[in-house]
């Protein structure tokens, strides 16, 4: 059976791309034909005057101007991600509006549509949030509607009352609802009166060997040891955390991320500062690391998959609930820190019982795959 997958646009987000890869991998292993729909927001055609006014405002507020990458620049910056997507993920032609999205689903011969995973139910991250509750298929019973590991990204309700009422009606038309966070189970019941199952992020459904096969298919020279720093928000507080950890652990720090993710001049002189390293290199960083510091949900996930000692830095803006829910599954709540005052030698040298973690993962993985399988069959 053909299965459409509706997730957030794939571009340079390591975790986002790998969860899309993993979900397709599992659905394919269950005997279906998955295709991820390349649904994204049409970039506005902003006038020159508006661009200038916006940059003046940025300069006044933040003291610097951030320029947007144009289409050709993005192709260069994301070339390794695009290479991975083209090789491993069946991705449709780009769809910009809800009419084209509906036409793609209806004419594509899909038996089911799966919304997820990642923060598909978070307004600030998803293009036209109504689409991720499948409003364009309202009343259509010919296509099975499923959510797998969808996430609100936070335990704070971000929908207004009109949206809440609308999405409540839409979600009741889903044949199966599952979410990635424990807090989301409660939100679905309290706000939508819908019973949701708590399941694993797709990346945790795959055994480590599958990721190792990706590395074998594209060997990398990136074989650094020490502390893998995968911290997305470069605040002073987080820099202090990294320095303190390096000092206590007596380890060098390495990264696998562009030197710059913001364009602060009209033209780019050296693209090497902006290019996102290959996904295989990012995965290998976990494999070779002796320790991991991250403020990323998927950074935490891959630390667990590769059995690496780690600390996760709480990210209030990106959504702390995601980390709490994930770590509670494995009894690792003590690995979550908020600031440099939480860092000490007792925490950093405290061993993680990965034997127990791995046993829990096997059971959770088995249950999540079973629920996904049943949702596609029933």
Language model: regions and residue ranges:
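Active-site anion-handling motifs in enzyme catalytic cores
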Residues: 1-378
């Amino acid at each position: 059976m053909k299965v459409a997958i509706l997730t957030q646009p794939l571009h340079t987000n390591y975790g986002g791309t790998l969860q899309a890869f993993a979900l397709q991998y599992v659905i394919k292993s269950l005997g279906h034909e998955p295709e991820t729909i390349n649904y994204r927001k049409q970039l506005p055609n902003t006038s020159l005057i508006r661009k200038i006014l916006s940059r003046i405002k940025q300069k006044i507020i933040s003291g610097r101007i951030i320029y947007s990458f144009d289409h050709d620049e993005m192709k260069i910056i994301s070339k390794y991600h695009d290479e991975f997507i083209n090789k491993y993920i069946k991705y449709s032609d780009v769809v910009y509006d809800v009419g084209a999205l509906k036409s793609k689903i209806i004419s594509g011969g899909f038996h089911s549509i799966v919304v997820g995973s990642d923060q598909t139910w978070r307004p600030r991250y998803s293009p036209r949030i109504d689409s991720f509750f499948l409003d364009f298929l309202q009343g259509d019973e010919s296509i099975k509607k499923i959510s797998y590991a969808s996430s609100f990204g936070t335990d704070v309700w971000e929908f207004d009352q009109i949206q809440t009422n609308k999405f409540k009606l839409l979600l009741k038309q889903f044949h199966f609802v599952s979410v990635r966070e424990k807090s989301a189970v409660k939100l679905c019941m309290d706000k939508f009166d819908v019973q949701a199952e708590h399941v694993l992020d797709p990346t945790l459904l795959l055994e480590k060997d599958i990721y190792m096969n990706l590395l074998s298919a594209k060997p990398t020279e990136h074989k650094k040891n020490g502390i893998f720093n995968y911290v997305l928000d470069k605040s002073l507080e987080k820099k202090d955390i990294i320095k303190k950890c390096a000092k206590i652990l007596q380890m060098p720090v390495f990264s696998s991320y562009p030197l710059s993710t913001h364009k602060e001049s009209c033209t780019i002189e050296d693209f090497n500062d902006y290019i996102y390293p290959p996904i295989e290199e990012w995965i290998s960083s976990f494999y070779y690391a002796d320790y991991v510091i991250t403020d990323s949900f998927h950074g935490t996930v891959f630390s667990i998959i590769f059995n690496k000692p780690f600390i996760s830095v709480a990210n209030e803006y990106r959504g702390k609930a995601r980390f709490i829910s994930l770590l509670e599954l494995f009894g690792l709540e003590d690995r979550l820190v908020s600031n440099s005052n939480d860092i000490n030698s007792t925490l950093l040298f405290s061993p993680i019982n990965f034997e127990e973690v791995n046993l829990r993962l096997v059971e959770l993985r088995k249950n999540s795959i079973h629920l996904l399988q049943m949702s596609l069959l029933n």
